[in-house]
């Protein structure tokens, strides 16, 4: 039915109007094309469902093989416990039935297939039948089996970590070092076991992650195939739609051709053409009545058969639509549950990892505390041992020093006793010449003699002390006098240097002023030569007042002595120097100022020969130097 086109029904006319027959034919063609599209889509869905079921069966077989390999591993010892709750979830849920493997026959019974372990990803599809949906006992039993081992694993891990904490506390509080190392060895064994268990759990986790990644890739491949099938279905539907449009166009063109053959070209001939066609049809009815009845019966049978097929296809399509929607809903629900389970497991794994890291940090901290305590005790022990050794050496050294001192003391005591005896004998033998004869044998005379000798000795001692004090006093006096002399000499040198510095500063300033005056005079000469005019040149103030009568050779700048820096801040008027003056102009007049009395920089004694000079002939400059007395009195 799919490979052949629509049935062509020959209608000679007379029984059914041509318009109704063409409309029914078009309806049948449309229904046929629509049913073809639905059948093709249903076929593609069935093929995709079969492929997905085959992939799911293959994945379940792989998961069962992994579970068997996991069960073949040696069981862990009860003392160690378990640290991987994910490994216990791999072989528990295995009694859930799958969907039927023949999607084209919905009346077949589903066969039970074992379910793979939950990988924690959204790529694991599971077909759930309505019986399983209505049985909450099976789902609750599966969930209980899936999440059952977690408390046991957690309890074993807590027991193992409690044992480690107990061992650490005992190790930290143990005073005996031998028992301490025993506890440390036991803790090392426990850590070795825990490390092996963690390594096994990491291997299992890596296997499960690989399986989850493989399932995810296969799920993506299935999704890609499904999308590709949907695209092919859409393309086929579009192609059938285009064929339907082409058929419609052919039918319309055939109808137009039949209408055009009955009319010559004008709209007025349409009614006459129709009447002629009706007359011809009525004439042909009488001619071929028997074959017309046979053709109509065959056409009716075919129409009934097509209607029956259409109703069956609609029913099948409805059933497949319901089944597809239910399967889609079940898959979505399963994906949601698996995602929720994956989120819960990831959260649980994160909590366990955080708890393990916290306990590991606590254990490391306790271990470091115990280690630091042991090191401190060993350091204290070594320090005490070193101190004891040092004290022993010190005691031995003091004993070695004490023995000669003891011998020396004994020797000195013996010598003192011998000297006392000799002194007593000498005192008993010697008698003073000035003492009366009655006092020789009396004890009062001996005591007076002893006192006299003591006074004489004390007097001699005092004389020697006075002599020493006198020598010290004389030495200090000579040192003081020498220091005063040096001080006076230094002060004189400082005064002389200060005077020289002051004089050199004054001369330097005078030289600067003279240079400025010469420069001004040169400028005036240049101006006079440039203008060519005669004018009266005013005399320079220094020229009128005259120069300072004393001239000294220039001296280098002196650095003041240490302690007399503030003396260099005293400024005195500079001595004016003789300057070269140009010859007076012919019409100029010289004004002679009265004599000016120059004063010395200080208020000392003034030399009458140097009191004043008149600057009439400014050619001569006195060269008599200032007395050393004035130089010395200047800075004072």
UniProtKB/Swiss-Prot annotation:
Chain positions found as Asymmetric dimethylarginine: 571, 599
Outcome reported for the amino acid change (mutating residue 286 to M): In patients with gastrointestinal diffuse large cell lymphoma; somatic mutation
Disulfide bridge partners, by residue number: none
Coiled coil: 20-73, 196-258, 294-535
Function (record text): Inhibits NF-kappa-B activation and TNF-induced NF-kappa-B-dependent gene expression by regulating TAX1BP1 and A20/TNFAIP3-mediated deubiquitination of IKBKG; proposed to link A20/TNFAIP3 to ubiquitinated IKBKG. Involved in regulation of EGF-induced ERK1/ERK2 signaling pathway; blocks MAPK3/MAPK1 nuclear translocation and MAPK1-dependent transcription. Increases cell surface CD4(T4) antigen expression. Involved in the anti-inflammatory response of macrophages and positively regulates TLR-induced activation of CEBPB.
UniProt effect for mutating residue 552 to F: Abolishes interaction with PI3K p85 regulatory subunit and abolishes interaction between SELPLG and PI3K p85 regulatory subunit
Sequence positions bearing Phosphotyrosine: 552
Modification note: Phosphorylation at Tyr-552 by SRC-family kinases recruits phosphoinositide-3-kinase (PI3K) PIK3CD:p85 heterodimer which results in integrin activation and leukocyte adhesion to activated endothelium during inflammation.
Chain intervals with Basic and acidic residues compositional bias: 61-71, 623-636
Location of region: Interaction with Shigella flexneri ipah9.8: 351-367
The protein's name: TNFAIP3-interacting protein 1
Ranges where the record places region Disordered: 61-151, 252-283, 603-636
Keyword vocabulary terms for this entry: Coiled coil, Cytoplasm, Inflammatory response, Methylation, Nucleus, Phosphoprotein
Record flagged with keyword Nucleus: yes
GO biological process: cellular response to lipopolysaccharide; defense response; glycoprotein biosynthetic process; inflammatory response; leukocyte cell-cell adhesion; MyD88-dependent toll-like receptor signaling pathway; negative regulation of canonical NF-kappaB signal transduction; negative regulation of ERK1 and ERK2 cascade
Region spans: Interaction with Nef: 94-412
Chain positions found as Phosphoserine: 77, 284, 403, 442, 627
Tissues expressed in: Ubiquitous. Strongly expressed in peripheral blood lymphocytes, spleen and skeletal muscle, and is weakly expressed in the brain. In peripheral blood mononucleocytes, isoform 4 is mainly expressed and isoform 1 and isoform 7 are almost not expressed. Expression of isoform 1 and isoform 7 increases in leukemic cells.
Organism domain of life: Eukaryota
Residue span of region Ubiquitin-binding domain (UBD): 452-510
PTM sites of type Omega-N-methylarginine: 599
Predominant location category: cytoplasm
Residue ranges, annotated region (Required for inhibitory activity of TNF-induced NF-kappa-B activation): 431-588
Cellular localisation: Cytoplasm; Nucleus
Motif residue range(s): Nuclear localization signal: 524-530
């Amino acid at each position: 039915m799919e490979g052949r086109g629509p049935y062509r029904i020959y209608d000679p006319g007379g029984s059914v109007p041509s318009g109704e027959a063409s409309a029914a034919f078009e309806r049948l063609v449309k229904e046929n094309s629509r049913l073809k599209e639905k059948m093709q889509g249903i076929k593609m869905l069935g093929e995709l469902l079969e492929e997905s079921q085959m992939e799911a069966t293959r994945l379940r077989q792989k998961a069962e093989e992994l579970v068997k390999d996991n069960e073949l591993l040696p069981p862990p010892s009860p003392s160690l416990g378990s640290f991987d709750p994910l490994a216990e979830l791999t072989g528990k849920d295995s009694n859930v039935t799958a969907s039927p493997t023949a999607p084209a026959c919905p009346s077949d019974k589903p066969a039970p297939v074992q379910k793979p372990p939950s990988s924690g990803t959204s790529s694991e599809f599971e077909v759930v039948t309505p019986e399983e949906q209505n049985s909450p006992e099976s789902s609750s039993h599966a969930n209980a089996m899936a999440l059952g081992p977690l408390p046991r694993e957690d309890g074993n891990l807590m027991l193992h970590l409690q044992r480690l904490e107990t061992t650490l506390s005992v190790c930290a509080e143990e005073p005996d070092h031998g028992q301490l190392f025993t506890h440390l060895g036991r803790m090392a064994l426990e850590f070795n076991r825990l490390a092996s268990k963690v390594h096994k759990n990491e291997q299992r986790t890596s296997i499960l992650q690989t399986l989850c990644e493989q399932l995810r890739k296969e799920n993506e491949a299935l999704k890609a195939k499904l999308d590709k099938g949907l695209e092919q279905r859409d393309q086929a539907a579009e192609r059938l739609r285009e064929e339907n449009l082409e058929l419609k166009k052919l039918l319309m063109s055939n109808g137009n051709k039949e209408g055009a053959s009955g009319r010559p070209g004008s709209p007025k001939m349409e009614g006459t053409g129709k009447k002629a066609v009706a007359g011809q049809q009525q004439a042909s009815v009488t001619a071929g009545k028997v074959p017309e009845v046979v053709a109509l019966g065959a056409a009716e049978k075919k129409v009934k058969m097509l209607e029956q097929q259409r109703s069956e296809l609609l029913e099948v399509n409805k059933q497949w639509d319901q089944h597809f929607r239910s399967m889609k809903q079940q898959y979505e629900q399963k994906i949601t549950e698996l995602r929720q389970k994956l989120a819960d497991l990831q959260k649980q794994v994160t909590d366990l990892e955080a708890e393990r890291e916290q306990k590991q940090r606590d254990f490391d901290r306790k271990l470091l505390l115990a280690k630091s305590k042991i090191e401190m005790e060993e350091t204290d022990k070594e320090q005490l041992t070193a101190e004891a050794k040092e004290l022993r050496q010190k005691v031995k050294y003091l004993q070695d020093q004490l023995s000669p001192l003891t011998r020396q003391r004994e020797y000195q005591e013996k010598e003192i006793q011998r000297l006392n005896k000799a002194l007593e004998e000498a005192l008993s033998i010697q008698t003073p010449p000035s003492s009366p004869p009655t006092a020789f044998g009396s004890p009062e005379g001996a005591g007076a003699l002893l006192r006299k000798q003591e006074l004489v000795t004390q007097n001699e001692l005092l004389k020697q002390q006075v002599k020493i004090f006198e020598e010290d006093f004389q030495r200090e006096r000579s040192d003081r006098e020498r220091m005063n002399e040096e001080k006076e000499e230094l002060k004189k040198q400082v005064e002389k240097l200060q005077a020289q510095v002051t004089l050199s500063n004054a001369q330097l300033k005078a030289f600067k002023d003279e240079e400025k005056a010469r420069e001004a005079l040169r400028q005036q000469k240049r101006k006079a030569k440039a203008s060519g005019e005669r004018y009266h040149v005013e005399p320079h103030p220094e020229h009128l007042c005259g120069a300072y009568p004393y001239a000294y050779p220039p001296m280098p700048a002196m650095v003041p002595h240490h302690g007399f820096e503030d003396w260099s801040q005293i400024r005195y008027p500079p001595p004016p120097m003789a300057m070269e003056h140009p010859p007076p102009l012919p019409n100029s007049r010289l004004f002679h100022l009265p004599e000016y009395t120059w004063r010395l920089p200080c208020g000392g004694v003034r030399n009458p020969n140097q009191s004043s000079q008149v600057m009439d002939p400014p050619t001569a400059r006195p060269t008599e130097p200032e007395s050393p007395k004035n130089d010395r009195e200047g800075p004072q």
